Amino acid sequence: LSSNCTPLKPPAIIKNGTIEKYKYIFISPTSSLTSSSGAIYGGQYYSSSASVNPSDVISGILTKKGFIRLPELRRHVTGETLIVNYGESGRRNRGLGYTIEVTIQFISSESNSLICSCTAEGQGSTEADDIRQAITRCLSGLFSNRN
């Protein structure tokens, strides 16, 4: 249940090329984040925690889309490989909390040029939820805009 009146911003997509010609992905490593939230109900304190590793979320979504994740860059498939970079790119106050914005880039392993990128924000019960939602919205926006 959300008491926020302001909607999340729609994902922003930049497309300089098509990712359909690529078969492999190499995802830059990211660190796990663990966050928690708590509340008092009827005089009792309840808490929950959530953990997320952004590269695992990205990998799961892209693998489901048919990409093959490589554990390292391989020279013999350079022309078919995208390097995937992730970063947190902002925060915005929204209602009683804030959103976390993420940006994901898809770089050609062969030319080191930006093929496409997406930026989206998420807001959940914890920062881990925010990040997971932002990544999902970002990639959903990218794949729903495929030509």
Listing of model-derived features with the role each one plays in the protein:
Residues T6, S117-T119, L139:
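Secreted/luminal cysteine- and crosslink-motif detector
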Residues L1-K65, N147:
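A structural "domain/chain start" motif
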Residues Q133-N147:
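Short, solvent-exposed cationic patches
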Residues P11, Q44-V52, S59-D129, Q133:
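Surface-exposed short loop/turn segments
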